């Protein structure tokens, strides 16, 4: 298996954690092997978001990790993020593709095959698929069935990242064979040992 074939561990930040603490937690996750960080912040002023995103981008650069911004293309551009992640209620992928640099990564959350096909057609680089399990990070998350995940996998030629309530203990072979990695919030950031928890995830992802 080459490096590019390894399933990736993707950290999504939690805006409920004080930022200085979040920065330290993110560093531990990067040391543990996280290779993608998505900055997600709700109800914050743009100036504060840019300051936080810039600090996280610098940290990701130190570890050679990709840094993405959730929803806010303006913030992503301001801090020279590697890309953005957008949801179904955000800007169309085709418009985001026009605004972002040509080499920018655009990830899109999808919930079914139809949304996946549209995102791919419009120029998405990867898809977040879920929620695979119940999650405290998003109140309105609808659970995705294994059948739907397989349908999305069957029509996708870009990486799929599982999202929603994922832990090292609920990932099974049926789920993993349809994913290129997993995106995690609570299972990492609420861990007593983030570095070791990251390694635990990667050990499961490498099997």
Swiss-Prot record:
It comes from Clostridium perfringens (strain SM101 / Type A). Belongs to the thiamine-phosphate synthase family. Condenses 4-methyl-5-(beta-hydroxyethyl)thiazole monophosphate (THZ-P) and 2-methyl-4-amino-5-hydroxymethyl pyrimidine pyrophosphate (HMP-PP) to form thiamine monophosphate (TMP). The gene is thiE. It comes from the Bacteria. Coiled coil: none annotated. This is Thiamine-phosphate synthase. Pathway: Cofactor biosynthesis; thiamine diphosphate biosynthesis; thiamine phosphate from 4-amino-2-methyl-5-diphosphomethylpyrimidine and 4-methyl-5-(2-phosphoethyl)-thiazole: step 1/1. InterPro entries: Aldolase_TIM, ThiamineP_synth_sf, ThiamineP_synth_TenI, TMP_synthase. Its EC number is 2.5.1.3. Keywords: Magnesium, Metal-binding, Thiamine biosynthesis, Transferase. The keyword 4Fe-4S does not apply. Mg(2+) binds at residues 71, 90. Its cofactor is Mg(2+). GO terms for cellular component: cytoplasm. Binds 1 Mg(2+) ion per subunit. Pfam families: TMP-TENI.
């Amino acid at each position: 298996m080459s490096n590019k074939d390894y399933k990736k561990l993707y950290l999504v930040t939690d805006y409920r954690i004080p930022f200085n603490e979040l920065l330290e937690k993110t560093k531990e996750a990067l040391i543990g092997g996280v290779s993608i960080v998505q900055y997600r912040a709700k109800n914050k002023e743009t100036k504060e978001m840019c300051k936080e995103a810039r600090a996280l981008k610098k940290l990701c650069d130190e570890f050679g990790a990709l840094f993405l911004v959730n929803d806010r293309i303006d913030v992503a551009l301001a801090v020279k993020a590697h890309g953005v992640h957008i949801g179904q209620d955000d800007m169309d992928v085709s418009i985001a593709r026009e605004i972002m640099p040509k080499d920018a990564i655009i990830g899109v959350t999808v919930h079914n095959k139809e949304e996946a096909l549209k995102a791919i057609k419009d120029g998405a680089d990867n898809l977040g698929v879920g929620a695979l399990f119940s999650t405290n990070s998003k109140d309105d998350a609808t659970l995705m069935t294994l059948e739907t995940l397989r349908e999305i996998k069957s029509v996708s030629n870009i990486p799929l990242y599982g999202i929603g309530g994922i832990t090292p203990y609920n990932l099974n072979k049926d789920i993993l064979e349809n994913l290129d990695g997993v995106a995690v919030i609570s299972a990492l950031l609420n861990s007593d040992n983030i570095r070791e928890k990251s390694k635990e995830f990667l050990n499961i992802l490498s099997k």
